[in-house]
Amino acid sequence: GIFQWSAPSNIALVKYWGKRDDLGHQIPANPSISFTLNNCKTITSVAFEKKVNQDNWSFDLLFEGQPKEEFKPKIQKFLERIAPFMPFLKDYHFTINTQNTFPHSSGIASSASGMAALAMNFMSIEKALNPEMTEEYFYQKASFLARLGSGSACRSVKGNLVVWGNQENIEGSSNLFGVPFSRKVHSVFENYQDTILLVDKGEKQVSSTVGHDLMHDHPFAARRFEQAHENIDQLIPIFENGDLEAFIKIVESEALTLHAMMMTSMPYFILMKPNTLQIINAIWKYRNETKTPVCFTLDAG
């Protein structure tokens, strides 16, 4: 058989940076909330056929139609992590064919959309085996599985505004999967546009995994994790009343805080480029002069 899913990338407004390795795989040290990026997506098909040898994993990986060996270890690791929750996967050989509508490893989270699309394909196989599965279970488990491939992928499964991580004031929020933000959202955010500027087209010098690990002994980590909770609390009424000035303050502060954490870790590193600062200053100048409520956020790369 064959299934195909597309999943969008997402951009966090309140950033996920730091993991609780003591609690298991891909458990966030703080909650995050993200906008879904509808036009930046990964389209993935998974063809599957029964195989004889069920002791090991068997899959071929095509990226934009061409074999891509260097992506295989990440998929292998993902399969190993989800195996306890999907034991039937070892019965099949998979041909995974994936493509993005945006550049890979350029600071737009292709691992988020990629793992979300893959998780939904695997859930479609499980649903074919268990047709009585509910839609709610399908998407919640897909988000749970996607998280095991890439933390932020759990925010790319379902919803326009998605929360991941335990947050007291947000019903149903969990460290294990993302949930659509269920509170009232002002119409100003319904058609909020996200323009992506690629400042530097090279791959980032420090992987997110390494960056997350550097939060373990970070001198400012504990305060940062508290701040993320506080910022999500503040965003709840902002989303309801459409206060763009307050929204901008939190979103820009979060972006700069994320990069401040990188600059103050040990070893320290800078993923911003000189042009990034030029763009930030140009946005501030334009906003000041025109009073247009435009703001920036930054990804981890």
Feature-to-residue mapping (PLM):
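A generic structural signal for well-ordered coil/turn residues at beta-strand boundaries
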Residues: 7, 29, 40, 158, ...
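Residue-level signal for inorganic ion chemistry
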Residues: 44, 247, 299
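Structural beta-strand/beta-sheet cores of well-ordered domains, especially the beta-sheet scaffolds
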Residues: 3, 9, 31-33, 42, ...
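ATP-dependent small-molecule kinase catalytic core of the GHMP/sugar-kinase superfamily
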Residues: 134-288, 292
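ATP-binding N-lobe of GHMP and related small-molecule kinases
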Residues: 1-106, 120-136
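Long, hydrophobic, well-ordered secondary-structure blocks that form the structural core
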Residues: 96, 104-156, 160-163
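Active-site-proximal beta-alpha loop/turn segments in soluble metabolic enzymes
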Residues: 103-105, 265, 301
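Acyl-group transfer acyltransferase/transacylase scaffold of fatty acid/polyketide systems
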Residues: 294-301
